Amino acid sequence: MAGLLLTGCDDDDDNNSTADIDVGSGDTGVLNFAFALEQLEAAFYERVKGGDYYKGLMANSAEKQILDDIALHEKAHVEFFRTVLGTAAIKNLEPNFDAINFNDRANVLLNAQTFEDLGVAAYNGAGRFIQTAPNLAIAGKIVSVEARHAALIRDIRQYNSFVAADVVDLFTPAQGATAPGNGNGTGLERSKTPQEVLTTANQFLKAGSRLSANNLR
C-alpha cells in the first residue's frame, strides 16, 4: 500500500446548503470521497453489533462470521485512508442511522446491501478521476473487496442473487448465437457518479457531516 500519491486538497465548505464538506479534487478528492464512504460503512457495522439481530446470532454461525469479517475490513479501510491522507483527510463524519432498525434482520441486511452496492458503484464511478497509477491500483484492490461484500450480503438475503441487473449490465447471448460474445450487455459492474452516490450517502449523515463532490467532475 506504499507509494500512494496525493495532489491537491479542498475540504472547505461550499455554497451548497445541503452539504457541509467538499471532498476536494484530483487524487486527494477521490481518496477523501472513498474515506467518507468507508467511514459510513464502518459506523454502520459497528451499530449492527449493538442490535438485537446481531446479538441473537449463534456465535459460530456463518452469518455472524460474515458480518464480523466485513466490519473488520471496513475498519481497516478507514484507517488505511486516514493514514494515507494524513492532514489532507476530511474530518470524522457523524452518521445518522435513525431510519434503520438494527433489531430487525431484514432491515439490517437491506441497508447493508445498500451501503455495499453503493460503495462498489462509487469506486467504479470515481476511478476515472484518479491521476496516478498507485492510487488507481489500490482503489481497484479495495473495490474488489467491496464487491465481495456486496455479493455475500445479497446471497444472505436471497440465495444466488449475488449478480443482478440492478448492479451488473448482464450479458445475454443472442438467440441462436454460436460464437462467444455475441449478444447484449457487457457483463460489467454498473457505476455511479460521485454526485449520484452522495444523494444516497448524505441521507445517512448528520448535518455538519454531509458531503459534496463538486470538484470531482
Regions found by a protein language model. Give the residues of each.
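C-terminal motif of bacterial Sec signal peptides marking the signal peptidase cleavage site
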Residues: 4-8
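All-alpha RGS (Regulator of G-protein Signaling) helical domain and cognate RGS-like helical scaffolds
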Residues: 11-217
